[in-house]
Amino acid sequence: RNWPWFKRLIGASFLRHAKHQPFKEIIIDADHPSTSFLPKLWQRDDECYFFKEYNPDIRVLIVHDLGPLDDKDKPTYYGGNSSPSVWCHEFDGGRQWYTSLGHDIATYATAEFQQHIMGGIIWVVGNNKPLDYRKAHAKTPNDPLPY
């Protein structure tokens, strides 16, 4: 938890979460594969996670609408009544995508949330060329794979 490299990779540190309840997510960046198909205001029934120690290099994709949230201890952020909930960034030679949503089985059963997750995975993988596994063989057990 106190490993600075890991905090920069993840993009923030967990602070706390509100009780499970309905709230809205605001799509900030609709050009990302994990958000491009979502409505501008995305109604959720989930736990609203709060974070601290944000990496300034993250690209915020979605924020929580904190205004109507039922939570007497909700912190006040520089963004006012919003708080980042989904973000991504390029980091240390790779890519990272994070969603703070998805705390029950019903959420993962929806096609919309599955597409959200798949869009994040697609972005992380990027435009890598597929490997030709026909070339992945060794003549002896100690030979390196030729790809």
Question: What are these regions, as identified by a protein language model?
Answer:
Residues 1-14:
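Helix-loop-strand module that forms the ligand-binding subsite of alpha/beta enzymes
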Residues 5-7, 44, 89, 125:
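Intrinsic disorder/low-complexity segments enriched in polar/charged and small flexible residues
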Residues 7, 35, 118-122:
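Non-transmembrane alpha-helical segments in soluble domains
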Residues 12-92:
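Catalytic beta-strand/loop cores that center a nucleophilic Ser/Cys/Thr
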Residues 68-86, 90-147:
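Extracellular ligand-binding/catalytic regions of CAZymes and related secreted enzymes
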